[in-house]
UniProtKB/Swiss-Prot annotation:
Family annotation (Pfam families): ABC_membrane, ABC_tran, Peptidase_C39
Protein name, as recorded: Alpha-hemolysin translocation ATP-binding protein HlyB
ABC transporter domain mapped to chain residues: 468-703
Gene Ontology cellular-component annotations: plasma membrane; type I protein secretion system complex
Subcellular location(s) of the protein: Cell inner membrane
Domain ABC transmembrane type-1: start-end pairs: 154-436
Length: 707
């Protein structure tokens, strides 16, 4: 067997490409399932293996001159097994950036070098989620399926709009008859008939107009509800990394952009578009009256469009600046209210007020620029309208004087022209709203187009046992950030109580975040009961893992609602039992409303120790198989901590427990203590075993606390 088969480059390529598409892969499992003869993955088996990972793959033949049109990275397949990954094509420089699987390094190839290696076979790769994401991208096209869904209602709206346009056509004709026939021939009987008919038309026009507005508002309200529900569901399904990389105020500002879309959908903009679409009916009648006057109206329409096109880019930039400043204000406001205790304690209100005044002044200035530009745009529209009116008046009067047009026809023509120009002017005047909605859709798209935690096709076993394995874990929060965990190998048996200690920033809490599948490691696997968490349903996992943090958040509900948050229908007895284990029952019983006491926003009505004990009860109430205490007792007074530690045997019974603590006395009775330093496990053992090594880090930390 030659060297190219000693190392399976196909398997290595699959591992790299899967990682690129945020798909976890177990090389040993792939090898076991698809490399049955041990000679490496062939083309067919490689494609099957990729599809088993939910990757969308397609093998194609491409000439070199067509490679700059394909989606990269892609796998270049070679018959001798020495495949490589094509990552970038520069046709101008005739260079190719590849990842050499044999050298395990990127390389830049000249045209001649690439031609020598390329055999014409290439495999295109995309993740299913990315394909779905592209299809479901949120922009203006998102509303098309919604319109199709409610097509019956929109068809009714269109029918009503047609009748409204016909009624609008009848009214000018009546005025023409009155001016040219009734007044000239003094036909009172004809006048009475026309008046009655016009009254009937006006009544029907009002009824149909109100009906159209009602139908349209009803359907757009449904779309609004769907969009709002989709937005909130999507927001809660986003990974925790999304929120950690963005300011709270910025996310809130983006969500509030839904109001702009709502106002646009329920406003007059869309009905104006419908009115404009049926304007061809009026053009036909107007042309019959006077081609010259009609041409004046026709030539004015591009002027409206050109003026709007000229204003739009500037207006959009200023609206974008206004939004950014508003988002900054939202973030600063949320931050200030959240940190109000710190602000008051440090007496920094004047400094915070000064910052707010500057930011508010910037926002107001940006808003003023938008208003000024919008006013200029509207006045430009008015100028075009008045100019057209003057030209039509002058030309129409000439036509009447020359006998080519009657006075009644001129009046009717101007009324018909108004039916065309009015929606155009309305659309031009609400162009600012449309620009705002365009920005709102883009901003909202930042939320809705962000990939959620994947649930489809994930493992969802009924119950876990609690065996945890970290295998060759390497992790960093961002590609350009320092390594947080490096080569972590750790096995935790079912029912074991593990203490994790170390200096701040050593990676202790990150380890537990991987157990909760908040993140997927850059390299290696986290296994629970032998199942890779990268392939697990996050909700299934988190329902069976109880977590108590150093700073827990309670919702503005009753105590019983907070404890039974994950299962609101559970019995009161279970809630009370969990509260007793957490040492919370006694103080809850002393409250006037007991378990029905409203805790306030983020638990503001309770002390820090009380909030912590309720959080512990909340973690215990579902009887999780894995329980994580991340500095959970650091905020407790000694009496409360004593109650927790006294009940620790009951708390730990039948479950795997991980305790992260700076206070080493908290973990001295653990089955095993893991000592971490700079993202690595440097020591592990029982309390006495670690203390027996005087030069150990654990001994050093213990000595510091003893002193």
């Amino acid at each position: 067997m030659d060297s190219c088969h000693k190392i399976d480059y196909g398997l290595y390529a699959l591992e790299i490409l899967a990682q690129y598409h945020n798909v976890s892969v177990n090389p040993e499992e792939i090898k076991h399932r698809f490399d049955t003869d041990g000679t490496g993955l062939g083309l067919t088996s490689w494609l099957l293996a990729a599809k088993s990972l939910e990757l969308k793959v397609k093998q194609v033949k491409k000439t070199i001159d067509r490679l700059n049109f394909i989606s990269l990275p892609a796998l270049v397949w070679r018959e001798d097994g020495r495949h490589f990954i094509l990552t970038k094509v520069s046709k101008e420089a005739n260079r190719y950036l590849i990842f050499d699987l044999e050298q395990r390094n990127p390389r830049v190839l000249e045209q001649s070098e690439f031609e020598a290696l390329y055999q014409g076979h290439i495999i295109l790769i995309a993740s299913r989620s990315s394909v779905t994401g592209k299809l479901a991208k949120f922009d203006f096209t998102w509303f098309i399926p919604a319109i199709i869904k409610y097509r019956k209602i929109f068809i009714e709206t269109l029918v009503v709009s047609v009748f409204l346009q016909l009624f609008a056509l009848i009214t000018p004709l009546f005025f023409q008859v009155v001016m040219d026939k009734v007044l000239v021939h003094r036909g009172f009987s004809t006048l009475n008939v026309i008046t009655v008919a016009l009254s009937v038309v006006v009544v029907f026009e009002i009824i149909l107009s109100g009906l159209r507005t009602y139908i349209f508002a009803h359907s757009t309200s449904r779309i609004d509800v769907e969009l709002g529900a989709k937005l909130f569901r999507h927001l809660l399904a986003l990974p925790i990394s999304y929120f950690e990389s963005r300011r709270v105020g910025d996310t809130v500002a983006r969500v509030r952009e839904l109001d702009q879309i709502r106002n646009f959908l329920t406003g007059q903009a869309l009905t104006s578009v419908l009115d404009l679409l049926f304007s061809f009916i009026f053009f036909a009648v107007m042309w019959y009256y006077s081609p010259k006057l009609t041409l004046v109206i026709l030539f004015s329409l591009p002027c409206y469009a050109a003026w709007s096109v000229f204003i739009s880019p500037i207006l959009r930039r200023r609206l974008d600046d206004k939004f950014s400043r508003n988002a900054d204000n939202q973030s600063f406001l949320v931050e200030s209210v959240t940190a109000i205790n710190t602000i008051k304690a440090m007496a920094v209100s004047p400094q915070m007020t000064n910052i707010w005044d500057k930011q508010l002044a910037g926002y107001v200035a940006a808003g003023f620029k938008v208003t000024v530009l919008a006013t200029i745009g509207q006045q430009g529209i008015q100028l075009i309208q008045k100019t057209v009116m003057i030209i039509n008046l002058w030309l129409g009067a000439h036509l009447v004087i020359s006998g080519d047009l009657s006075i009644g026809q001129l009046i009717a023509f101007n009324m018909l022209a108004g039916q065309i120009v009015a929606p155009v002017i309305r659309l031009a005047q609400i162009w600012q709203d449309f620009q705002q909605v365009g920005i709102s859709v883009t901003r909202l798209g930042d939320v809705l187009n962000s990939p959620t935690e994947s649930y489809h096709g994930k493992l969802a076993l009924p119950e876990i046992n609690g065996n945890i394995t970290f295998r060759n874990i390497r992790f960093r929060y961002k590609p350009d950030s320092p390594v947080i965990l490096d080569n972590i190998n750790l096995s935790i048996k079912q029912g074991e109580v593990i203490g994790i200690v170390g200096r701040s920033g050593s990676g202790k809490s990150t380890l537990t975040k991987l157990i909760q599948r908040f993140y997927i490691p850059e390299n290696g696997q986290v296994l629970i009961d032998g199942h890779d968490l990268a392939l697990a349903d996050p909700n299934w996992l988190r329902r069976q893992v109880g977590v108590v943090l150093q700073d827990n958040v309670l919702l503005n509900r009753s105590i019983i609602d907070n404890i039974s948050l994950a299962n609101p229908g559970m019995s009161v007895e279970k809630v009370i039992y969990a509260a007793k284990l957490a040492g919370a029952h006694d103080f809850i019983s002393e409250l006037r409303e007991g378990y029905n006491t409203i805790v306030g926003e983020q638990g503001a009505g309770l002390s820090g120790g009380q909030r912590q004990r309720i959080a512990i009860a909340r973690a215990l109430v579902n009887n999780p198989k894995i329980l994580i205490f991340d500095e959970a007792t650091s905020a407790l007074d000694y009496e409360s901590e004593h109650i927790i530690m006294r009940n620790m045997h009951k708390i730990c019974k039948g479950r795997t427990v991980i305790i992260i603590a700076h206070r080493l006395s908290t973990v001295k009775n653990a089955d095993r203590i893991i000592v971490m330093e700079k993202g690595k496990i440097v020591e592990q053992g029982k309390h006495k075993e670690l203390l027996s090594e005087p030069e150990s880090l654990y001994s050093y930390l213990y000595q510091l606390q003893s002193d």
